[in-house]
Amino acid sequence: AEKQTMLEMSLTHEIGEQNLQFKPILAKLYADNKYELMWKDKAAEKQFLREYAAMVASGISKRSAQSLINLHNAEKTGGLTYDVLLSDAFLDYLYYSKNVNQQAQRWLYATNAYKPELPNQEIIDQWQSAVKNDAVSGFVNGLSNHNRLYRETVQSLPSMISASGISEMGKKLALNAQRLRVIPDFENGIFVNIPSYQLKYYRDGKAILESRVIVGKNERRTPVMYSRLSNVVVNPPWNAPTRLINEDILPKLKRDPGYAAAHNYSIL
């Protein structure tokens, strides 16, 4: 404990008091690295910040947003302080990127639901190995999702940012980008865009069929998922679920006895 306290005091001596998420581990990492910069590769820095800014813009974490503000404020000063703040934010992003696939339903469907935590030591060691071997760009690139729709969405975000901040449409787009992040890239498959009520069928990376779809109401949301399909039944027989009958169809039948016939419902 005494050694850790000394390490943290040494880091504070080097960069002053900073609002860090992961000061204990950063104090050790930078001491081990003799306080040399870890972000000498500017291409890796740019790539990381693009991904991190897209994550922050989605609104899933106020703490991550504060880290991005701290980075922006320290950018002009640069040097070791900026480098440590970059690493602090990167540990946040590292934990997020390694766990979002398992936590998507919890983190990406509620405001400020994601709480940054320290990544496991094995992942941190892999990052430090990349730093020592000048391979940070490759390491950062490996954390991203190469889903084409995700990449295109992230690339469109800067156009929605002004001096007053990101637009409401931009925030929605950023959140949808994070939801796309958990979907692997695919050349052949069916992609359903729930907010726009649209389905697209892709073959060899090209959309060859588009169709309107019916989705659930806000109080009965359509599940979000990724799955492999072994077969598709076209125009299957369908019985209305009990909840839909009770909450939607019966009230309409009470108002209009001819509703069922007008909408081709058969009462069994």
Q: At which residue positions do the language-model features occur?
A:
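Well-ordered beta-sheet/strand-loop patches within structured domains
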Residues: 1-20, 31, 91-92, 111-112, ...
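Cationic-aromatic interfacial patches
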Residues: 1-112
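Structured beta-strand-rich cores of soluble
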Residues: 97-133, 206, 226
